[in-house]
Amino acid sequence: MKLLGLYINIPWPTKRYKYHDFKFPEYKKKINEKKYIHHLLQDLKKDSLLVPNRTINTIFIGGIAPNFFKLTSIKYLLKKIKNIIPISKNAENTIEFHISKLSEKKIFYYKKFGINRFSIRIQTFDQKKFNSLSKVHISKNILHKIKKINIEKFKNINLDLIYGLPKQSLQEALLDLKTAISLKPNHISWCEFYIEKNNNNYKNLSKSCNLNIIWKIFLQGEKLLKKSGYKKYEISSYSKTNYQCLHNLNYWKFGDYLGIGCNAHGKITQKNGKIIKTIKNKNLKKFMNGKYTYKNHIISKKNLSLEFFMNRLRLNTPIYRKDFKKYTYISEFYIKNEIKQAIEQNYLIETKKYWKMTSKGIQFLDSLLEIFIT
């Protein structure tokens, strides 16, 4: 049986990172946690009907800052989920942390509730740059807050960093990475800064560092991570042995997952091979009134191959040919022309067992994916 993930979206607080493009309405009044969790559970009850007799293998509580919720709220949520759908005894259960609400006390209690992986959104250790990106400013030194947490004691912790920030130098970016490595987490997410053009803060935050500097940051950062014992297994994810994020791996392998909460997305494979995409209402008010689903649709054959490769090509591993049919229920014959074109343009190499990106394919990933669009 394929793995099944559960993504829980908690899209608060209303003050977020300025570069995010989420379209949630801003609420001046504090939103009732108890009411939102009630609707999360009702949403899960409906979605659980799509996956009869299946067990949850990974849980990811995200949405930028779910740790703004009270401890009692998270405890209640996890307890009630078990009454709706079975959870594997060995499930990986992750929660995201906003740095401003980070505390060892919270991590300690989360562990008691069954959470065994923690993802801390640092973005940068440079306090001025952090405050220029985040609508939630912090007065205390970021590194000091992290050092108060015994990372080695809690083991399964991810530190989330961004490079190529506005006006960031090569030295500043590498210092961020060296600082994160010195804290000895078993997982580091390290991705390039990006902001949508339609974001209200685009003019202020789009003055990124020079492309040549970004390339140097990437090359030197990759060497630094490798030298420090971190293996790259996805475009922006690096881990020590046995500490890959199983939830994200399932996602990038084109596995199934339920998505509950405002603006959450899910993907479910039916017994007949049809694959359903679920999209929840991004209007928080409507969601809180019980209108959970915005749209459910079956992914067409044409789009299935594109979505499969969009996900799988993010992983730093060969794509086994048998997996294409396993996850899409489509014969490899259906994409023979696209594969042939990708090989001819030196984006992919093909063996009897797998396809693998060439260095050119990695460098021109968007061009490779365009082959599956036409």
From Swiss-Prot:
Keywords: Cytoplasm. Its main location: cytoplasm. PROSITE patterns: RADICAL_SAM (PS51918). Residues 1-231 form the Radical SAM core domain. It is found in: Cytoplasm. This is Putative heme chaperone HemW-like protein. GO terms for molecular function: 4 iron, 4 sulfur cluster binding; coproporphyrinogen oxidase activity. It comes from the Bacteria. Coiled coil: none annotated. One of its GO terms (biological process) is porphyrin-containing compound biosynthetic process. Might be a heme chaperone; in E.coli heme binds independently of binding to [4Fe-4S] or S-adenosyl-L-methionine. InterPro entries: Coproporphyrinogen-III_oxidase, Elp3/MiaA/NifB-like_rSAM, HemN_C, HemW-like, rSAM. GO terms for cellular component: cytoplasm. It comes from Buchnera aphidicola subsp. Baizongia pistaciae (strain Bp). The gene is hemW. Belongs to the anaerobic coproporphyrinogen-III oxidase family. HemW subfamily.
